[in-house]
UniProtKB/Swiss-Prot annotation:
It is found in: Cytoplasm. SUPFAM superfamilies: Ribosome recycling factor, RRF. One of its GO terms (cellular component) is cytosol. GO terms for biological process: cytoplasmic translational termination. Keywords: Cytoplasm, Protein biosynthesis. This is Ribosome-recycling factor. One of its GO terms (molecular function) is ribosomal large subunit binding. InterPro entries: Ribosome_recyc_fac (IPR002661), Ribosome_recyc_fac_dom (IPR023584), RRF_sf (IPR036191). It comes from the Bacteria. Signal peptide: none annotated. Responsible for the release of ribosomes from messenger RNA at the termination of protein biosynthesis. May increase the efficiency of translation by recycling ribosomes from one round of translation to another.
Length: 186
């Protein structure tokens, strides 16, 4: 394994960490409605748990209301229960075959709590990126010890991985700033 291979592998893993962080951020509720909010909701479909997107069409009625239309009429109750039981504090209302999910306004206190949650998630993502940097540096040391690469190559590789780490940590910080702005916007 060369410096380039190690760098490429680390970059792919860092990108996956960013994607996971992005998915975690999407689950954090802001005052506005978006269909991605319900992506992780699991519905009991004849005894097996399936994502809501497999049993219903999820859309937006307006900026503060999500509409969910189950494909089978008899699934309306199960879908409504799944939305109510998810940890987002939502209160769906059924109107015929359509379930309307209004987004309650966030209190100032809840907004501050959510920004703390976002910062906590960000710290976890940064730790993951830094751990990948550490693993890469250990890999470089091993390659030097095995005399596969020179110490100059090791230093160059460590510098490149550090630049990647800085880039991804900055990207995480940028995403946090955007999410906090979104949460604090009334």
């Amino acid at each position: 394994m060369s410096v380039a291979d190690t760098k490429k592998s680390v970059e792919q893993k860092m990108q996956k960490s960013i994607e996971a962080f992005k998915a975690d951020l999407a689950k954090i509720r802001t005052g506005r409605a978006h269909t991605g909010l319900l992506d992780h909701v699991q519905v009991d479909y004849y005894g097996s748990m399936v994502p809501i997107s497999q049993v219903a069409a999820v859309g937006l009625a307006d900026a503060r209301t999500i509409t969910v239309q189950p494909w089978e009429k008899k699934m309306v109750g199960a879908v409504e229960k799944a939305i109510r039981d998810c940890d987002l504090g939502l209160n769906p209302a059924t109107m015929g075959e359509v379930i309307r999910v209004p987004m309650p306004a966030l209190t100032e206190e809840r907004r501050k709590e959510l920004t703390k949650v976002v910062k906590g998630e960000a710290e976890g993502a940064k730790v993951a990126v830094r751990n990948l940097r550490r693993d890469a540096n250990e890999q470089f040391k091993k390659l030097v010890k095995d005399k596969t690469i020179s110490e100059d190559d090791e230093r160059r590789g460590q510098d490149e991985v550090q630049k990647l780490t800085d880039k991804y940590v900055a990207e995480i910080d940028k995403m946090v700033a955007e999410k906090e702005k979104e949460i604090m916007t009334v």
